[in-house]
């Protein structure tokens, strides 16, 4: 049963190293405190996409994707996704590589609780988004398993978006806030644990 599986944030999870377990963090920018630095999308070379919970959406078959004007041409000019979609503050906010992130606030009408997506390098996350923090040895381990970090993250994202995991999260959820502790407690068996260990030994 799922309750027997290792939890994402466990010390004995396949992704954990001696130094660090997988941590889930809230997005680096507090949207209220930095409201003057967040503006509507305006494409220039230096524009940095600002990703909020509202940018996580699903297609008609339930695949999660990021609906943000930096990556899609089909967003109407007055759409909510265009507002507060660009970081216009100081550029010294740390730039992260690609990472896995999840909507932190669930809308009443959405069927899924968990909406995970791979966020491209250089994007800035608001605090309506949670993301998985992995140190370099963990990222290296994922890369070795799948040959390429981007592919590894997309593959892991598929696992995190699985229906049974979403059902589990719904069964245990207290409210419409998806917090980092809840995500670290997700039972996640990645399914490559044995094959990779054999390859390493």
Language-model region placement:
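Polybasic, glycine- and aromatic-enriched phosphate-binding surface used to engage nucleic acids
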Residues: 1-200
